[in-house]
Amino acid sequence: MPLLPSTVGLAGLLFWAGQAVNALIMPNATPAPAQPESTAMRLLSGLEVPRYRRKRHISVRDMNALLDYHNHIRASVYPPAANMEYMVWDKRLARAAEAWATQCIWAHGPSQLMRYVGQNLSIHSGQYRSVVDLMKSWSEEKWHYLFPAPRDCNPHCPWRCDGPTCSHYTQMVWASSNRLGCAIHTCSSISVWGNTWHRAAYLVCNYAIKGNWIGESPYKMGKPCSSCPPSYQGSCNSNMCFKGLKSNKFTWF
């Protein structure tokens, strides 16, 4: 099942406005067939930053902000989602994101991991108030995305996006992408589409299970939590399939 194709489009113009600029989904539109999740976990373990070099490139505050913002977007999708899963932090995904971010390469990667893991990228030159500022443009793509009606998915769902790209948003709200791991690294120098940026904040977010498959919609439309996977045993919180305590508090932005 191929991934959604990517187009650079107008995203690069955001640089001149002083805003966060976003990379797109990997241009390779024909990945290898799905492999067992254990394969991805072995790759994640092999791609971690060596312990002697390890310095966490994300604070607990930023980690919570990234996770809470994603869950806020997932809980408030329209049309409502019947099978949206609550997203949790995954240390292995975060370490893989850290290993990639520290290389300061403005591209999706590493290539061997992209077969199994979704990824969103953002880069910002200058000051920013919150890590949320680095990913707001991802969620704002929802204004350009038209969710396919069930009658249009016969059997494959059409891809409808009237903007430069919508695939950052669809990865954020892909129902089964219930694990997130991100890293932020300040690159002293990084080449972004032919321009050299200095002291740029580089955000890498990895997602599992990988989303953005052609012919599939991000989630199943319907009453919230009405089609949760059996593993959730009917537990629901804030419009999402939820395995934790129902008293869990979320911080919305």
UniProtKB/Swiss-Prot annotation:
Residues annotated as signal peptide: 1-24
Gene3D superfamilies with a match to the protein in the record: CAP
Protein name: Peptidase inhibitor R3HDML
Positions bearing carbohydrate: 120
Residue stretch(es) of the prosequence: 25-56
GO cellular component, one term: extracellular space
Key words, A-Z: Glycoprotein, Protease inhibitor, Secreted, Signal
Family per similarity comment: Belongs to the CRISP family.
MF term (GO), any: peptidase inhibitor activity
Subcellular locations according to the entry: Secreted
Origin species: Homo sapiens (Human)
Summary of the function given for this chain in its UniProt record: Putative serine protease inhibitor.
Ranges where the SCP domain occurs: 67-207
